[in-house]
Amino acid sequence: MTIGVVGRKCGMTRIFTEEGVSIPVTVIEIEPNRVTQFKTEETDGYRAVQVTVGERRASRVTAAQAGHFAKANVAAGRTVMEFRLEEGDYQAGDQINAEIFAAGQLVDVTGQSKGKGFQGTIKRWNFRGQDNTHGNSVSHRVPGSIGQCQTPGRVFKGKKMSGHMGAERVTVQSLELVRVDAERNLLLVKGAVPGATGGNLVVRPAAKARG
């Protein structure tokens, strides 16, 4: 099974095992994932299911989006995601919930990392600082040399320098699913996941566990 679900990060807490061991967990609320389209090899060239979650005001929905949602007979959502399918069939209007997962399963969680703005090389790339004394002036946090001389006469692409940090799509792999609360549609994942509280998360079965 490769299909995943879209959820919302609720925050972190901890639970205790019967032996009294504390386990840090992230709580992910899996809102009903409403199927907006089922793609097949005959019509689209591949098998996939498209879902939407949450709500969006009608004034924020374009005419094309409104027509797409109306065709599927589902309410407009705040985001649309697509998952490839190896097996199984879905109909527009179906709902996918937390029940597709089981406790003890390994999952990959994808989200947008917290934006940190413009940062220097020490915070962004873990560079070490230069000497605080011994003749060093106004160069305590500078990166140092960024290249050569007349040859090649340029800075190579990919050079680690200051710049915008965070606000990127990040995936944390092979996290243990400690508990599944199907009644409240909650997933408790061991450890931390990307993004701020309230952000969208995509939870999939772990790719490495599938082999």
UniProtKB/Swiss-Prot annotation:
One of its GO terms (molecular function) is rRNA binding. Belongs to the universal ribosomal protein uL3 family. The modification N5-methylglutamine is found at residue 150. One of the primary rRNA binding proteins, it binds directly near the 3'-end of the 23S rRNA, where it nucleates assembly of the 50S subunit. InterPro entries: Ribosomal_uL3, Ribosomal_uL3_bac/org-type, Ribosomal_uL3_CS, Transl_B-barrel_sf. Gene3D superfamilies: 3.30.160.810, Translation factors (2.40.30.10). NCBIfam families: L3_bact. Keywords: Methylation, Ribonucleoprotein, Ribosomal protein, RNA-binding, rRNA-binding. This is Large ribosomal subunit protein uL3. It comes from Pseudomonas savastanoi pv. phaseolicola (strain 1448A / Race 6). HAMAP family: Ribosomal_uL3_B. Methylated by PrmB. The keyword rRNA-binding applies.
